[in-house]
């Protein structure tokens, strides 16, 4: 029995060593987080299918430049240009929109009419909250030093109160001792990096952090009394808001400390206590998740938007209040926030 155990251990060791060598030569898994660091997907392109899509294109084509961002290559006359990065989660990266169709692309076209010296790239990272934005800022944006960084934040920070976000694992304080060990191994081993990212993919799927279309007329309705609505709001107030405020203030501080002027954006959403003009559906009564509805979700998101608004006033940061400017009309959305 002992000899068999030794033989099995030797076989496993040889297999893992061979797998490690093979993955170091060629790794077919282009994961964008390794250990507690971001790996930008430089010079990568994706073709993403959306079976059964109605509002989204059935196939989207996404290209990343030498920086790992969406958009044009950085100009050689960098110091002479007005350089801008847009930073956010999936509502900024927009993997469900092909090249040229994101809001960053539209912003570039509009600014180019009056400022042809502008360079704008999309540094959005699907699934990231302000935890991930801080890592991106420290590891990449500070050294790149654009003149302006536009931050669209809020929605993914809500997920921290109810589900493990993709990027919470970028903060070692959020990890168990065992997971910290796996993170350390992922920094030094291709096999461990693949294993860790497969775990992240599973958790992301289970947390429902993904993009789908919403069929408003087919959704169930849910009525919540004031007591239940207030309980949902109080959970956000006690679990997430202060941390979000601290991280957003840190983003502003680091940006300005490094000569980058931040611009804040509030997060719009389709849900709210209104009637959708395109479908005549009462958005406030639509059931969202296992416990909430459109009215409660909008009130929850507005707690985070209010944090952004207050920081804009207190720190003198320019604000684009998109949450109040964008119409709640399903013509402009594929799901609740995209």
Located regions from the model:
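Serine-dependent acyl-ester chemistry module
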Residues: 156-309, 327-330
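Histidine-centered active-site loop/cap adjacent to the catalytic His
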Residues: 5-7, 244, 310-320, 333-338
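Helix-to-loop transition at the C-terminal end of transmembrane segments
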Residues: 22-34, 274
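Proline-aspartate-enriched helix->loop->beta-strand connector
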Residues: 141-150
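Hydrophobic membrane-insertion alpha-helices, especially the h-region
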Residues: 7-23
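Membrane/wall-proximal cationic-aromatic binding patches
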Residues: 30-110, 114, 328-330
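Conserved beta-strand elements of the Class I
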Residues: 83-87, 121, 149-151
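Structural motif
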Residues: 126-137
